[in-house]
Amino acid sequence: MEDSDSNTDKKFFFKKRRIDSYNYSDEEDNNSSMNSDMTYTNDALKTSSGNAPTISKLTKTYGIGAKLLSSMGYVAGKGLGKDGSGITTPIETQSRPMHNAGLGMFSNTNSSNYHSENEDYLSSEDEVVEGIEQVKFNKTSTEVLGEALLNDSGDMTIVRTLRELRLAGVQLPESILKELDPLNAVPKPKKDVVVEILQELLGIEKSLEAIRQRTSPLEVQVKEYYGQERLLSELEVTLRDESKHVSLYDKIGAILKLSDDELIDRLTSCLLRKELLIEFDLDHLEKPNDILDELTQIIELLAYRMDTTSKFLNRTQTTIFKVIYPKLKKFWEGFDMTKSKIDSAITLLLDFQQVLSFIGCKEHIMEEFVYPKLLQELDNWELHDEVDHVSPRIWVLDFMVLIDDKIKDTIVDKIEAKFFAYCKNWYHRESFCITNSDIIFIKELICERRYYKILCKEFLPKFLDELWERHNDPIYELEDWKEKQEWKEKDSGFFYFMKKLRSYTHYFHPKQYELMMRGTFNNINKILYQWHLYSTVEDLHKSKWWLNWLMNTVFEHSLPTEIELSEIRKSYNIFAMSHRYHLDKSTLDEDFDLRQGLRNLMETQVIDDISQSEQEPTYTVQNIPLGKVSSSFKDVVEDYCLEKGYLISKIPNRYTQLPYGRDQDCIVPLFEIRNGKKKMEVALKHDILWVEDSSGTFKPIYLWALDL
């Protein structure tokens, strides 16, 4: 029998441990059970069989709260306050769907799994607590949370309705409130009438609140309409004024004060259709056009208000289009790449740039009339001037500010391809020499790095192989130096090489040409050195005659440059050493290697590492590191002054004291801003602009407010 009891206790303990959400230890449960049995000996809790339940069953139903109440001396049917007062209704708890999940979709979606997994334990709990009555807290005379005792649901309805009315701002007469005080003394029929009236009043108040919420925006709109009506009245007076005191710009400015975009569009288009009459003479485009200037200002004003990104034109844009485009179309249909037409086209595009962009015609004109002519002219250009064609160097750079990036890249690629083909197919006896102006144009257009890369890869090796190696030998000129021949008629030899070298000077980098001249005169100096070393005294003067003849022939048609003069002086220095009977090799470089020198020069100075430059990222406003941004507030102020035409300069040894910083005492240098005869002194500190007023005090202002 004892064994069976012990087994029963073990089974009961196992169930208790499985459903005990607080996981209390066995010792706590046993101690609490002993104390609770003593406390609940005389309480009113009874089971269905009439016996007092054990404390373990009580804790299974109410958890730790029952333990705490028993420890505090709780007796069933009485409160815990003085004289048995206290709360009469226990706080009802709600179990969560999952013991380890919080709020949200996860706990809801998994609650069924939790219930299914613990179904056995929950059913066991129901079996344990089945038949136990709820704990009842009998309230005495103490009020709950300070409220009066309410007998039925009607009293609660009255109290709640009065509270809602008070929160809604409805003040009931004092006489009605006195009739309801105390509420227990009011007869039930009267209570029913009061409830009905109060609820009806509350419904009316809610309806009024809804109406107020709907009418509040309408009141704002009504005020706006009154303001628009006043503006329309003023606008009518302005538009009816046919005198010249009110300009078209002022009239459109008055229209833009309205808030209705559709009305603005209609009025503006109607006004422009009536008053915009623009004429221009293609033969006198340089003359100022006041109407065009006013139209440009009007478009700048309209661009802030109208959406010009849409592919469909509004009424205002359509009106301007009908006035402007037909007149411009006549010119563009007859456009060709002659000098006069090119100048007129650039002038028209610059003058009408904002107008054409506003009406969406700029890209159409460029793609339909301008771009095809430009690209065709580039295809026909052979890198030299022709009678029937205008060189691209005259018009390409001017058009660069007007064309888009895609066409810019196309033009650059075409010029680069032509120069590459020229260098690749170059031959010294057949190929023409590109003029210096065209070489400068090509460098500027495709950039010097790409220019020298093509030159050193394609042109320079051919130049060295065909001219330097085969014709650069002054010793051949010793045989007939006395004969007066025209060297320009010869197609070989040293003079032919010098003629070609000097004609292609502008092709090379200055350092490259300097190396070539050094190598050329180094060969001449070797001959002079041997002449002075092995010849007789009588023949020494002949070497000077030979050098004079050589220089006079080479530089017959053009004076030598500074680089060439430097090498000429080194050669004549040999004669000075000969007169002193001391001849050294200071003017000679026996180890000189032109190809190696040019190769070193290309790697270090002339040609940068193109692959390294291509690896550098392209920075934009979005990805540029802050470490590479060096702009300061002083730079911003200087840029602003530059745009306004002001001159800003620092005043030497002049400082002022500003009420700025923690101690309100900051010493900063002074700057002077001038605009003609007007000037003012300013100070800069921590992105704040301080301007001196008439009293000599410096006060902070916004940069846009700086005006002279």
Swiss-Prot record:
Chain's role: Involved in pre-mRNA splicing and spliceosome disassembly. Promotes release of excised lariat intron from the spliceosome by acting as a receptor for PRP43. This targeting of PRP43 leads to disassembly of the spliceosome with the separation of the U2, U5, U6 snRNPs and the NTC complex.
Main location: cytoplasm
Originating organism: Saccharomyces cerevisiae (strain ATCC 204508 / S288c)
InterPro entries: G_patch_dom (IPR000467), TFP11/STIP/Ntr1 (IPR045211)
Record-annotated disulphide pairs: none
Assembly: Component of the NTR complex (NTC-related complex), composed of NTR1, NTR2 and PRP43. Interacts with CLF1 and NTR2. Interacts with PRP43 and PRP45.
Protein localization: Cytoplasm; Nucleus
GO molecular function: nucleic acid binding
Residue span, G-patch domain: 61-108
GO CC terms: chromosome, telomeric region; cytoplasm; mitochondrion; nucleolus; nucleus; U2-type post-mRNA release spliceosomal complex
GO process annotations (BP): generation of catalytic spliceosome for first transesterification step; negative regulation of double-strand break repair via nonhomologous end joining; spliceosomal complex disassembly
Protein name per the record: Pre-mRNA-splicing factor SPP382
Keywords: Cytoplasm, mRNA processing, mRNA splicing, Nucleus, Spliceosome
Miscellaneous comment as given in the Swiss-Prot or TrEMBL entry: Present with 556 molecules/cell in log phase SD medium.
